[in-house]
Amino acid sequence: SNTIGKKESVFGQDIDGDGSTFDVNNITVTAVSTDTSTTANTAVTLSKDSQGGLYITKGSTNIMIVDSNDAAVAFDWSQTWAGETRTSIAYAVEGIDSDSDNTIDKYKLAVKHELKNNSSNAVTNQWQTIEISTAGVVDWSTETFGEAKLHEADLNQDLDGDGSIWS
C-alpha cells in the first residue's frame, strides 16, 4: 500500500503531501464492492482510502488494517510472468464472535488470488484468509490458503459464486 498515513503522527509532519497529517477519524474511505455481507451483528465493510490503505468500517468507525509495526498492509497486486498473470485482491472482511457473546472478538479478511494462463485464458482461483485483531493488526500466524467455501460461513457471503453459503 502507498498509505503512509499512520506514520505521519510519529514524525509529526505531512509525509504524503496531501496537506494534512493523518487522522483516522477524518479519512474518506470507499467500500470494496466485493464485500457484500451487510447483515448480522458481525457485519462490517472492507473499505479503502485514496492511496489503497485498507480499513474495517462499521458505521462511522474506520479501523486501519496494519502489521505489527503499525504500517499499512497491501494485498492488491498483479504480476505477469512466464505466460501467466497472477492477481490478488482484498475481497471481504467480517467480524468473528468467537465466544457467542454478541461482540466482535476479531475479524477475518478474505483475499482472492487469481491465476490466469494467458495462452488458454484458463483461470484458477485460490483464497487466502487472515485474522485481524479488533485493533486492526494482522495476525500472520492465522494465514490460510484454500477453497472459498471453507470460509463462506465466517464471512457470511457466497465467495465462490455457486449461489449458497457453505457451512
Locations of regions flagged by a protein language model:
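Long, low-complexity, Gly/Thr
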Residues: S1-S167
